[in-house]
Amino acid sequence: MQARYSVSDPNALGVVPYLSEQNYYRAAGSYGGMASPMGVYSGHPEQYSAGMGRSYAPYHHHQPAAPKDLVKPPYSYIALITMAIQNAPEKKITLNGIYQFIMDRFPFYRENKQGWQNSIRHNLSLNECFVKVPRDDKKPGKGSYWTLDPDSYNMFENGSFLRRRRRFKKKDVSKEKEERAHLKEPPPAASKGAPATPHLADAPKEAEKKVVIKSEAASPALPVITKVETLSPESALQGSPRSAASTPAGSPDGSLPEHHAAAPNGLPGFSVENIMTLRTSPPGGELSPGAGRAGLVVPPLALPYAAAPPAAYGQPCAQGLEAGAAGGYQCSMRAMSLYTGAERPAHMCVPPALDEALSDHPSGPTSPLSALNLAAGQEGALAATGHHHQHHGHHHPQAPPPPPAPQPQPTPQPGAAAAQAASWYLNHSGDLNHLPGHTFAAQQQTFPNVREMFNSHRLGIENSTLGESQVSGNASCQLPYRSTPPLYRHAAPYSYDCTKY
């Protein structure tokens, strides 16, 4: 093992020591006579020069540098010993003869004899390719002879001592001999090859075992990966681990049939399909706008649609001309019902034709829009009874409330039912069952345009709860204003006052 630790100019800071020329372990005072220190990363041809192989010994005498003679040869110690043995006349040589051959052939090893000679002895004793031969008494001298194992002559590739194939071991040589004998001899006489054949035959069996174990270990994870594409509702309802692994993992199609009513996976029951089927469902078509987040299970609705005359595209508040039918105006706000909340009952007015239908369903919160026979001018408006006071941010407070029109007697019950529906959907905490006369107070309302009603829901203005102190029994709108009412915001064609017509 030769020293590669050398240092460059002592004035140069941060220089890696072994990348320069002079010896690191030189005697003190040797830095004065330095000859041409090298650069750190230079590819100079004198990179393998004098200082690269100088001795470790601090007592080594300072000699003038001879770079060409002191380059370490690119051979391993095993190659050097093999060269010495093969150059001997009898193919055997003593330890001292090996030393002498190396020093004569390579002047690099003429220095630091203690270091490399120790390495030579280690390699002779550790490598099985070198065989120790006892010395004859006939020849003078001392020490045993060293020779090469006959099977180790081909341990270097193509006779080059620069590359060695592998570490020589006698066990490998004996196995190779047995294999060769087994190949040459016929199968009945293969007695020598018997110990080697089970070892070779067991190798593919072990490989098969390994493959089987790997496939078994990987098999439980395969259904989770491959069965994500389950599309049939039967597979989602089975109790097999495949469907149980695939349904929560992300196959939405398998859980769609029971997804709306029960919401088993904790998914919200509201979807785009609900809105689309609300708009285009046939008469009597069932749908369940499941309230998965609100915790309410809503029964399916039967929505029979009536024939829609062209009056659906008329003015928004087409009130009846006679005073007796004061509650019979129709607000055709088709876009508001289906696109702002799918069933937002607070925008629309209910004609008197809905009184009988609503009186059959007194339980408001469980069936908010149960069996509404929609009137001719509404077509899917899904109206609830006059809660236009909830758009309190857009009312005109200057309009004085006229006296309420004579109301038919069965109107309080549908008003309460639809008021509960509005409070259920719009999250109003106040219970509106106590408003008997609040049903069709249509004359007191002044309508802004549809856009302002959209803005009120979009901006979240109508979050105030309706209590008993805020809404009185005579249906006069006494509501606190959360924001400044947008009076005179739009031009005359956009603001409709229902009390003028």
UniProtKB/Swiss-Prot annotation:
Per the record, residues carrying Phosphothreonine are: 247
Where located?
Nucleus
Listed Basic residues bias regions = 386-397
Q: What residues bear Asymmetric dimethylarginine in this entry? A: 458
The superkingdom of the source organism is Eukaryota
Q: Where is the composition biased (Polar residues)?
A: 232-249
Q: Where is the composition biased (Basic and acidic residues)?
A: 171-185
Q: Report what the protein is called.
A: Forkhead box protein C2
